[in-house]
Amino acid sequence: MKEDVLEQVVDDYLQFKGYFTTHNVRFRPRTDHPEYVSQQDSVASDVDVVAYNPNLSGVQRVVVVSCKSWQTGFDATAKLAELRGTKKNPKRPTWRHFRELWVPRWSEGFRTQIEALTGEPVFSYRIAVTRLKGDATAWPEDPTIKANLPGCSVGFLTLEEMWATMLDELTTTPAASEIGRLAQLLKAAGLTAPTVVAPPAAPPPGSDAAADEEDDG
């Protein structure tokens, strides 16, 4: 079920690119892994979108997307520092948001599940974000990430990039999704802009949205 708006945009974007998509693919470490910890590993995690394009080859054939729809944006430099332990973590440790990238037993279970679903041992892993801040180039070169996703491509998808692609490729044929139809209506009404209109504002302190952002870290 596509509950998150960013996830719906990702879905439409990938379908525009010719991919078949599925959602909320669950994975977890195997119970006989030597580093298995029942208190941490017994409940499955899931990845938001898995996309498959039979007309492509190599890592482009399968795209796996984890959506981080944080209103304050995604600071790639800060998050990687938290994963590395060089920056203080929020209340919920950052590695829990990136188990498949950072924890070998989870990465193994993740890759096994993706291969079982798609038949492909390597793929493109993308983190979809509302807005990207910091240095994103360090992520695919990080030794831990490279070791945990060998042969895979790692990078980011921004909402701006996906939305611009959708607006550019939309025709007058009614779109199949609500997000696609909304994009068509906004485009038809002339309510789209080629550049960023306003910078994002953080949620008001003490609001539910602010609490969610703090917990997501």
Please give the residue ranges for each predicted region.
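Intrinsically disordered, low-complexity Ser/Thr/Pro/Gly-rich regulatory segments
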Residues: 1-217
